[in-house]
């Protein structure tokens, strides 16, 4: 901003500030710059004008130019040299200008005005730039030492705020410059800068009293300290603030030769990188290098300095509570790069710690076994599965199963292999296999079904199975083998479980099988016949006792996984109803010889069911016999399918072609006459009745018309007559006046 000041020898006066783009005339009378009591001053003595040589205000090196043009009689002198009349010359700061030949001496000075704005919207910046342009100042995008003011609506801890406080520059509202412009235009005193301090809007500061005026203590706040930056982006952002405060900013590159004593030296502050910040791009090697430096600091009892503490140390003018590696971190300080650290987000064994009790993310190992092997092995790559709505028992079970090591996996595989030999030698009645619902697989995605199957297969009691092998291997042999069949085989063998489900209320044998099937369905397993033993169609007493013991063992798993598979129960119920209807229809079509065969089969091998049938009613007996016969028939069919399961193809993909264009077939109702074919497509119209359509139109006339009788206005007629007389009299007078100036008024016509 250019100012015209009176010289020291001249009479003291107020400085005259010159706005950009305005011409100031220096003269003796009716001028912007008025000089009185000097007879050598002309009325239009000289002209002063401030112009910008460039259109961009962000170029801080280019200041506006001040030019002067002499139009006087006695001349204008610049540094005691007379100017040529009618020519312009450029003035520099400090030049002495003399108007006339007497004591009208002045001095021109340029007062720097470089404004940097922070946290302003687009409209606020536009208004600010216009005011600065008229004042002859400049604007800067980033803070430099040449900046004189910082414009903010509210004080927040930013890099520009820190630099402005360190440099001792005032922080003002944008309205200050608008009021300053009005004061210059009206030639009044400029506003007080203290009344335009913005309010503090920073949660880290709170309600604490802070002095934001220029303090000398801030200029040497970081004297004797060395701030070590491990990232180039942080060094570029915060390095200038450290240097302004008298400190040293040093960028540490990866693979440097600095010793460990350098980081633990007094006055050395290692700035925290903030690995969890998504804006920073950190490679794996840099991450390891940063962790190594953090371990060095931890061994020496030091801590890294967050970015926010640099600003708080400048605001509160202390380095004891802030930017002190040996001190405790402040609880109210929030780093500039928020987010959990790596140690908080990921544990050592690789599992994810849940952030909320009802939204839990864990790594569940993929337990899909190979087709030819009955042993269950854990995959090396865990599969992430999200489980919602688990109770405390299931969470404990998840945490316990997620920490299985590879050694225990190998031992479990060996135990499973040993138990598999027992299964093949003794050939028990039923085996346990992973259960897959074909109805659910058609309606759900493959990914969700695979995650659900992995959860079911994984949470089977492996530890209990090894303990029971040592006590009684014969009883636990059914639990130790788990074979995963193809989808086609499971769809054919699955109705054996639900068919036994229906007869739970009538006979003891079906009730026992119902418990086993429910336990297996809740635990994610399905009961299917083995078919290799000769007595696979009968149920022995020892097997029933063993299954009762298994029910006690599986009770805990039922409670844990009841919430997981609650959605599958409606689907199983629907499937059981459909299969029951199909069985009833097939039974009605069977001949009487099949019914006799059914009674013969039910009479021999199951004595317990016969005793239960004798106690029930006659109608219930027939229903149970039909149900048991259908169950055994399905068991026999399943045996044949299991024998030929090795020849069946596995892992097939069902493809179905669908048309991508969906259109509705517009059906036309064609009316056909007798012998005339199709009728023509024509439309029927009907006149809509409007009000008054059936009446004659109402014609205005006759009595509807009223005669208009004009009244005579006597006053108006008298006024018109008077005006006519006045005009006639005026015409006569005009004609008489014209006759007086005629040379020959009476011209005789020949």
Curated annotation (Swiss-Prot):
Q: Name one GO cellular component term.
A: site of double-strand break
Entries under Pfam families matching the protein: BRCT, FHA, Nbs1_C, NIBRIN_BRCT_II
Motif FxF/Y motif is found at 737-746
Q: Quick one: where's region Disordered?
A: 429-479, 494-550, 581-622
Sites of the Glycyl lysine isopeptide (Lys-Gly) (interchain with G-Cter in SUMO2) crosslink: 528, 569, 580
- Residue span, FHA domain: 24-83
Keyword Lipoprotein in the entry? The reply is: no
Annotated region described as Interaction with MTOR, MAPKAP1 and RICTOR, given as residue ranges: 221-403
Q: What is this protein called?
A: Nibrin
